[in-house]
Structure formats: C-alpha cells, structure tokens
Amino acid sequence: MAVTMAEITKLRKISGAGMMDCKNALTEANGDIDKAMEIIRKKGQAVAAKRSDREASEGCVLAKKDGEFAAIIALKCETDFVAKNADFVALTQAILDAAVANRCKTLEEVKALPMGNGTVQDAVTDRSGITGEKMELDGYNVVEGAYTSIYNHQGNNQLCTIVAMNKEAEAAAHGVAMQIAAMNPIAIDEAGVPESVKEAEIQVAIDKTKKEQVDKAVEVALKKAGINPAHVDSEEHMESNKAKGWITDEDIAKAKEIIATVSAEKAANLPQQMIENIAKGRLGKFLKEVCLLNQEDIMDGKKTVREVLKEADPELQIVAFKRFTLRAE
C-alpha cells in the first residue's frame, strides 16, 4: 500500500530514523506504525551488531546531582558529528536522569533500566542502528555525601567531575570540582593512593636517580678525556658527527670504552642511602601532584586545596570525587 508523507513524518519523529528508512518500514508494515517501529528497531540492531568491532572514541559526557547523590555517564560514538547531535545528547541526558532517579550504583544497573519499549541498552542499540555508528555506555561513576557538586568543563560535554562533601559548601565544592577537572588527582590524600602505585613510583624514582648518577660520572670521564659527551651520546650521533669530521674512529672507540667501563664501575658503587633519599624526595613530589588536598589550588595560586578548604570551614572535608573524560591526556 502507498504511505503518506504525514505517516512518514510521524514515524520519523517517533523513531529518529531517516525518511527513506521510515517509508520502507511503513510500506513493509502496510502502514502500521507499531509494526514499522519494530522493523526499524530490528534493522538498527543488525546495523549495530555489524559495527560492534569499531572504535567509539567520541561521545557525550554529562554529570548530574540530586541531593546527596551525583553521577557521571558517557555515551560514546564514532564521530564528533554524531556526538554533537541534539538527539544524541538528549539520549545521554535521559539515561543519566534515569540513573540518578533510580540511584544506580553500577553501569550494569543503568543498562537494565526501563526506557521506552525496552531497556536503556536497547535504546542505545536503537540509536546506533539509526546513526550507523557504534555506540556504547562508559564511565559511569557515582559519589554520595551530605553535599554534592558537579562540573562540566567548558560545557562541551567532554570532561565532567563530581564531588561529595561532608557538609553544604556550594562555593568551596564547586572550586574543588573545577580543581579536579584541571589537575586530575588520583586520590584525596596520600592514604588513598594504592600501595602498588607508590611502590611503582618509588622504583621509577630509584631507577631514574641511578641512571642520572651513572650518566654524570660518564660525562665527567668523557670531558676529562677530551671528548664532547654530546658527540657520543648515541650510535646515531657518533656516526653523524664522524661524517661531519667532529670526531674520529679512534675517538668513538675510546668513548665507547669509557662509557662501558665507567658505567659498570659507577653502577656497582652507588651510595644506596643517597639514592633512596633522592627517590623518596621524588615520591613526595609525585604525591603532592596527584593528591587533591596537597595540590596547589588553581584559583588561589599559592595555598594548597587543604589550606583553602580549612579557611572556608575548618570542619569541611572532601568525601569522594570522580572524573571522566573522553580526551587523551
């Protein structure tokens, strides 16, 4: 049977599918809107399945708070064009609204929530079929506390933060949410940094310090032998500098011998206590950079976040925070 433009327009408004898809679905369903919707839905599922192995690196990140509960969610897609589409953003917001209203704690709970004629996951699959892009939910995080605050960085739906405080403090909480967005801390304080992270960082610091000590000894020995360390710091430089006439084969052989001998001797006689002390200092610097309370407050520029909060209210504390971004950092 022939379908009318009014019917096509109605189905398009309901489904969000393209004009031709709506026309074909209505024709196949003999004008039955409900059957046409099911046809579009099944087609969308098939399209989504074909795209399941693609990378979804764009998307929309949103945050919402409701009293003592706040959440972040990201709906990912393949292109910036779809990510900025009003319907895509609206779907992300609808999913977040449902998640917050139901106080969902996990992404699996969110996916299973009822939405439309199916679940949230069904709604995402349907939208994937309509746009022809892979879509997936990601980054669902929540915080709970006496007072919560959210921040959507620059309002571009790419980076959001949420923070929970032990008491109401609108300005301070908002400042903390902005701090988290800008400085990307991994914990509130040192106690929150996993021991595995500390151990890995101290090992990196030890290895770096040892290398610096060895390199310094080699540099001194090369200069003493009349060789410019910059001319022999790699095989590539040795060859290129020889071609320029800056060093000879004899210089290269001598440099290699000095580098090998001095490196081995210095590495075998490094003062362990000094190495550990330097490494601990570097760990302290790392913890200052990654612990929220230890960071320099981005708005004050001189005081730490801990000091700024104490000035605002001595009893004010950060209970929890989360941060999610789609951008590589």
Curated annotation (Swiss-Prot):
SUPFAM superfamilies: Elongation factor Ts (EF-Ts), dimerisation domain (SSF54713), UBA-like (SSF46934). Residues 79-82 are annotated as: Involved in Mg(2+) ion dislocation from EF-Tu. Keywords: Cytoplasm, Elongation factor, Protein biosynthesis. GO terms for molecular function: translation elongation factor activity. CDD domains: UBA_EF-Ts. InterPro entries: EF-Ts_dimer_sf, Transl_elong_EFTs/EF1B, Transl_elong_EFTs/EF1B_dimer, Transl_elong_Ts_CS, UBA-like_sf. GO terms for cellular component: cytoplasm. It holds the Pfam family EF_TS. Its main location: cytoplasm. It is found in: Cytoplasm. The keyword Thylakoid does not apply. It comes from the Bacteria. Associates with the EF-Tu.GDP complex and induces the exchange of GDP to GTP. It remains bound to the aminoacyl-tRNA.EF-Tu.GTP complex up to the GTP hydrolysis stage on the ribosome. This is Elongation factor Ts. It comes from Phocaeicola vulgatus (strain ATCC 8482 / DSM 1447 / JCM 5826 / CCUG 4940 / NBRC 14291 / NCTC 11154).
